[in-house]
Curated annotation (Swiss-Prot):
The keyword DNA damage applies. The gene is recO. One of its GO terms (biological process) is double-strand break repair. Keywords: DNA damage, DNA recombination, DNA repair. This is DNA repair protein RecO. It comes from Caulobacter vibrioides (strain NA1000 / CB15N). The keyword DNA repair applies. PANTHER family: DNA REPAIR PROTEIN RECO. Pfam families: RecO_C, RecO_N. Belongs to the RecO family. InterPro entries: ARFGAP/RecO, DNA_rep/recomb_RecO_N, NA-bd_OB-fold, RecO, RecO_C. GO terms for cellular component: bacterial nucleoid. Gene3D superfamilies: Nucleic acid-binding proteins (2.40.50.140), Recombination protein O, C-terminal domain (1.20.1440.120). Involved in DNA repair and RecF pathway recombination.
Length: 243
């Protein structure tokens, strides 16, 4: 079996003296792992970083078994962010969450395009943390656990939605949620609309929502915690006063 496609690198771990097992996210085939020979070379290391975009030429004797691949870089990749540690933390977290959450060899084009959209804005510090939250919400949607923020779960009202039920992932209005506000998750306005700016605490609230449902529906059933890179991102955003 052979194919060629564009992909984002999600992770790379050493295998043997000079090779690596590389996890890749493609649009048509989803998450795919492959052995890449010569990955330890100085030439290849820069485009084996999380978020690097590459052309993959993949070959396997039997479908479903670990194949081998050659990679060709597309553009400068994450190297453009090397002076921005916070953006690199966001990129590392996005790749780690996708690598841990997505099943192997199952197409999830929405996840591919969500990662693509995030990478495009990582050089804009004012907006990328909010886009990161939407990225995780998009992963939940792709995996069948999408949030329903269209109307109040209790009343059907479309206005003044300020909470999310931690049980169902559905929005709750201010009035309906008032008696239970200490048990509900605050819903930041930017998750309802791309219009308007970010208030203090909005990104933290958004990450709390997506993190809660990733733990509840994706990682919890697998007895896994959120990836360390995701937890590290929260710490780095707090240090930079971006929450």
């Amino acid at each position: 079996m052979e194919w060629e496609d564009e992909a984002y690198v999600l992770s790379a771990r050493s295998h043997g003296e000079t090779g690596a097992i590389v996890e890749l996210l493609t649009e048509a085939r989803g998450k795919v792992a492959a052995h890449v020979a010569g990955a330890a070379s100085r030439r290849m290391k820069p485009f084996l970083q999380p978020g690097a975009r590459v052309i993959v030429r993949y070959r396997a004797k039997v479908e479903g078994q670990l194949g081998s691949a050659t990679l060709e870089p597309m553009g400068e990749g994450p190297s453009s962010l090397f002076d921005d540690r916070l953006a690199l933390a966001g990129l590392s977290a996005a790749a780690a969450v996708a690598a841990a959450a997505l099943p192997e060899r199952e197409a999830h084009p929405g996840a591919f395009h969500a990662l693509e959209a995030l990478i495009r804005v990582l050089e804009i510090p004012e907006i990328w943390p909010a886009v990161y939250v939407r990225y995780e919400a998009g992963l939940l949607q792709e995996l069948g656990f999408g949030l329903d923020l269209s109307k109040c779960a209790a009343t059907g009202a479309f206005d003044d939605l300020v909470y999310v039920s931690p049980r169902t992932g559905r929005a709750v209005s201010r009035e309906a949620g008032k008696p239970y506000h200490d048990k509900l998750l605050p819903l930041p306005p930017f998750m309802l609309s791309s219009q308007g700016g970010l208030a203090e605490g909005d990104v933290k609230a958004g990450l709390d929502i997506t993190g809660h449902f990733l733990e509840q529906f994706v990682f919890g059933p697998l007895n896994r915690p959120l990836p360390p890179a995701r937890l590290w991102l929260l710490d780095r955003l707090a240090e930079a006063d971006k929450l």
